Amino acid sequence: GQGSRLGYEGPKGKFPVGPVSGKSLFQVHAEKVLKYSRKYGVDMPLLIMTSRANHEETEAFFRDNGRFGLAPENVLIFPQNMIPSIDTKGKLILETKSSVFKNPDGHGGSLTALFTSGALAEMKKRGIETISYFQVDNPLVKIVDPAFIGFHVLRNADVSSKAVKKAYPEEKVGVFVRFSSGAIGVVEYSDLPEEKTRSLDEKGELSYSSGSIAIHLFRRE
């Protein structure tokens, strides 16, 4: 994503977060991948989803910095897909008289982009079975968590997620919910009705208290 929310012009991953080192978010994550690759004796790839606005700049940043020690084949940068935009009345927004305005399809589109970009096929070819997913603006994320991965594998899960308890009802974080179909998913805080945001269970705790921190494991298949 773009770094506008951080007051930074350019890809969010280029934002410097090291108070002394000045390392960028991209460098922090790349060095973690390199460290764990050496620790476990494997070639662990770093996959980065970009948008049209920052794809080329992201590629150039990694290239100009020697991919922070990672081999070229272990840095896979792919663009997310674009979808038509609509206004509040559900009507298509035009970019020009003959073209529809489009926007990136968001975090959820990462799974589709992994497929359409050929990244999933590359992972299958390399025997990679588990995908560790996190947001670029989380420098503290434990990208390789043995306990989390072990639990995911033991349960033979398709998806595993980490959650944190909400600090207060209005905290701006998506929450895990169980839909009427029985499926579990994440509802953004902006989409959760106010009465459900403040709803309490029989113990007096928030009914929707499990906040999503966008750390997931996916089984490749």
Q: How would you label these PLM feature ranges?
A:
Residues 5-220:
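Domain-scale recognition of functional cores that engage charged ligands
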